[in-house]
Amino acid sequence: MKLYNLKNHNEQVNFEAAVKLGLGQQQGLFFPVELPTITPIELSKILKMDFITRSTEILSKFICHEISKEELYKHVKQAFSFKHPLKIKITKDIHCFELFHGPTLAFKDFGARFMAQMILLLNKKNESVTILTATSGDTGAAVANAFYGMKNVRVIILYPKGKISELQEKLFCTLGRNIKTISINGSFDDCQKLVKEAFNDKKLKESIGLNSANSINISRLLAQICYYFEAFSLISEEQRKNLVIAVPCGNFGNLTAGLLSKSLGLPIKSFIACTNANDTVPRFLNNGTWNPKKTVSTISNAMDISQPNNWTRIEELFYRKKWDLKKLRFGSVSDHTTEETLKELFKLGYVSEPHAAIAYRLLRDQLKENEFGLFLGTAHPAKFKNTVEKILKNKISLPSELQNRIDLPLLSHNINPVFSKLKTFLLEK
């Protein structure tokens, strides 16, 4: 698999290098030179496979020249060794596709665990690796869990202080060992900026073996393609004809993966890019002006991102496939409407959380006659226990993954969003 840097097309690397580097020169994201496709006959065969076999088949379309299918199967099985997604009926024409049945109760488990397996496989010389990543909530826990206790790997996670839920924080800031966490006095965009500055410091990058586990890393992105095929396999032939998928969007990695599944050959009619008040992309799609505003805090905190990294990949994909960007559906939802939507879902017999509620709301409002809709459930409601209980006035029991960590002390450090402070921390052995 060859990939090129979106900021410098002359910089081309293979899959192994892209996984290890994370970012290219000038902080550019890597994108596939070739966009593989599957025929309708191949698709029919793939949809009949079990999740692990199908995922191996899909991923091999991208990376078979570097990793054998047998080797890939082994690592996919290890990465996805948890309960697979569930489809839950909400109304006749709208179902929720739950992606939060992994060890950290969020869809990020798919990408983070596959990336950890790829680092394990590709680090043939057992070199020391430092994984630096920023999180707006769920990435931190997924990455920490995926790399916890892994030899020669140090993980450093940045997150905005006071802007993720208490239970999200408990999942990754109580581990210790090779997992280091730093709360930043600022927004997620400040955290992301610090990560990019670290990658721009060539000397630092080389001295500590710097890598990133955000959705900017191509291995995470490719892994997420797999569950879109799973979703398609779980619905009827009739429902497949006019399928619309609503995706809660923060850094837009989840939507990028969905669009890559469509590029590969999955016949999805349309996607809805769903945001909260941090609506840079909906405004851009509406008026053609890219104008990020200051990030605002919302009850759907994992989507509190005003400068999404993966948007450049989406634009590149639309350009390469000659798709019309105007056909991408979009919308943003306020906190008040999110709360009302959570109540609506509860009346329908479904306990959800703010991020999925936003996707449901926009799907419900935009779904046309004869269309069938899926909205992605990206995190377990218990991760937002206080918020959801306050809105629904209904108690939520904690899964064991959260119950086991709730009383553990936080081990986080705290710094201002100043690169020199982070650099000092990174250089400490």
Curated annotation (Swiss-Prot):
Record has Amino-acid biosynthesis as a keyword: yes
Q: Which UniProt keywords apply?
A: Amino-acid biosynthesis, Lyase, Pyridoxal phosphate, Threonine biosynthesis
Pathway given for this chain reads: Amino-acid biosynthesis; L-threonine biosynthesis; L-threonine from L-aspartate: step 5/5
Please indicate if the UniProt record lists Phosphoprotein as a keyword: no
What Enzyme Commission number(s) does the record list for this chain? Answer: 4.2.3.1
SUPFAM superfamilies attached to this UniProt entry: Tryptophan synthase beta subunit-like PLP-dependent enzymes
Q: Which reaction does it catalyse?
A: O-phospho-L-homoserine + H2O = L-threonine + phosphate
Q: Which cofactor does it need?
A: pyridoxal 5'-phosphate
Where are residues bearing N6-(pyridoxal phosphate)lysine located in the sequence?
Answer: 108
Q: Please give the positions of the paired cysteines in each disulfide bond.
A: none
Query: This protein's superkingdom?
Result: Bacteria
What molecular function terms (GO) are annotated for this protein? pyridoxal phosphate binding; threonine synthase activity
First-tier enzyme category under EC: lyase
Classification via InterPro entries: Ser/Thr_deHydtase_PyrdxlP-BS (IPR000634), Thr_synth_N (IPR029144), Thr_synth_N_sf (IPR037158), Thr_synthase-like (IPR004450), Threonine_Synthase (IPR051166), TrpB-like_PALP (IPR001926), TrpB-like_PALP_sf (IPR036052)
Question: What biological-process terms (Gene Ontology) are attached?
Answer: threonine biosynthetic process
- Per the similarity annotation, which family is this? Belongs to the threonine synthase family.
Q: Which NCBIfam families match?
A: thrC
Q: What does this protein do?
A: Catalyzes the gamma-elimination of phosphate from L-phosphohomoserine and the beta-addition of water to produce L-threonine.
Q: What is this protein called?
A: Threonine synthase
